[in-house]
Amino acid sequence: MIPLLFVVYVVAVKVFKKTTPNGKVTVYLGKRDFIDHLDHVDPIDGIVVVDNDYLRGRKVFGQLTTTYRYGREEDEVMGLKFTKEMVLAKEQIVPQTKEKMELTPIQERLMKKLGPNAFPFTFHFPASSPSSVTLQPGDDDQGKPLGVEYSVKTWVGDHAEEKGHKRSAVTLAIKKLQYAPPTRGRRLPSSLVSKGFTFSQGKINLEVTLDREIYYHGEKLAANVIINNNSRKTVKNIKVYVVQHCEVTMVNAQFSRHVASLETREGCPITPGASFTKVFYLVPCAASNKDRYGIALDGYLKDDDVNLASSTLVSEGKNTTDAIGIVISYSLRVKLNCGTLGGELQTDVPFKLLHPAPGTAEREKAQAIKKMKSIERTRYENSCYAADDDDNIVFEDFARLRLNEPE
């Protein structure tokens, strides 16, 4: 008989935790990033653990809040505020008010592990809540950055309206993100524009086509540019940009930033009657925009997993004009310089920049690349974990760990 060897792979579940300054209350969350699937949003499922004989008749409350900052703190004068803070959900966690609560798998495992002093809670995002976005501040900005942030707060008090003491309260910053659809589709975005001249016959034709409609963060954009010069003017050079468009709905403000660019004179000058065809490649990423004011991110640059803010998606039947918060979109812009008297010829081709959906091959590939690039960080984090072999649960302090964090 040939002996059979079975290899069992045990996958540890990472759980994030944060404890109040007095060490009496600890909050556990299974994740920090919650995904908007358009038809539903991942629930915020967590556990609160309270030390024995600490409450003495008091209660533990929790709430989900969002902070929408659309103006600088330095400009807030004479009582004028450029921020809106809204409580999206609030409930009493300890003692529980619900007779029976449906638990998620991670809550069941944590309840079993943490014992009788563990109490579950669940919050839900409203259907129209915006995604998390942070606008990169400038060098002179001293206050909090503009953007949309979410947090889960728990505190100890006698009633829900009581703010609670800082020593018995804990706040956990979370993010609400959107992922790309499971399939990207076969549509190839394109644009065709022409430019005529007042005192000259003929036109310059510019056609730009992208190789796909949806790109994942870190992927290379390929733009096929075709120029036909049927005029008497000459094309001096070509500029290609990836443009990030931001709309701050609260104040109806719109602005754009270049997150990737190149300029070339290859094939130039394109003289009358000539044609030019070339594929240009650009990679928009947060790492190349560290010093750019106003760039929209899905976190902070000090976090190693930060990306450019994803394109804003809306559910079927709705328009992006119905979105609230900070609406993000992207386009690839090609600009031709036709000389001093000829002016410029420009066109924009819109596309979407998103995270790959969980379970897709692109998602697995992205996770593998990210893991390879952060081996040292992983070793650092592993030294900070407290693992449990019985339940395969790994606890990590909720604060984002950084290799270069000062002591």
From Swiss-Prot:
<dbReference type="GO" id="GO:0002031">
    <property type="term" value="P:G protein-coupled receptor internalization"/>
</dbReference>
<dbReference type="InterPro" id="IPR011021">
    <property type="entry name" value="Arrestin-like_N"/>
</dbReference>
<dbReference type="GO" id="GO:0005737">
    <property type="term" value="C:cytoplasm"/>
</dbReference>
<dbReference type="InterPro" id="IPR000698">
    <property type="entry name" value="Arrestin"/>
</dbReference>
<keyword id="KW-0716">Sensory transduction</keyword>
<dbReference type="GO" id="GO:0001664">
    <property type="term" value="F:G protein-coupled receptor binding"/>
</dbReference>
<dbReference type="InterPro" id="IPR014753">
    <property type="entry name" value="Arrestin_N"/>
</dbReference>
<dbReference type="Pfam" id="PF02752">
    <property type="entry name" value="Arrestin_C"/>
</dbReference>
<protein>
    <recommendedName>
        <fullName>Arrestin homolog</fullName>
    </recommendedName>
</protein>
<dbReference type="InterPro" id="IPR017864">
    <property type="entry name" value="Arrestin_CS"/>
</dbReference>
<dbReference type="InterPro" id="IPR014752">
    <property type="entry name" value="Arrestin-like_C"/>
</dbReference>
<dbReference type="GO" id="GO:0007165">
    <property type="term" value="P:signal transduction"/>
</dbReference>
<dbReference type="Pfam" id="PF00339">
    <property type="entry name" value="Arrestin_N"/>
</dbReference>
<comment type="similarity">
    <text>Belongs to the arrestin family.</text>
</comment>
<dbReference type="InterPro" id="IPR014756">
    <property type="entry name" value="Ig_E-set"/>
</dbReference>
<dbReference type="InterPro" id="IPR011022">
    <property type="entry name" value="Arrestin_C-like"/>
</dbReference>
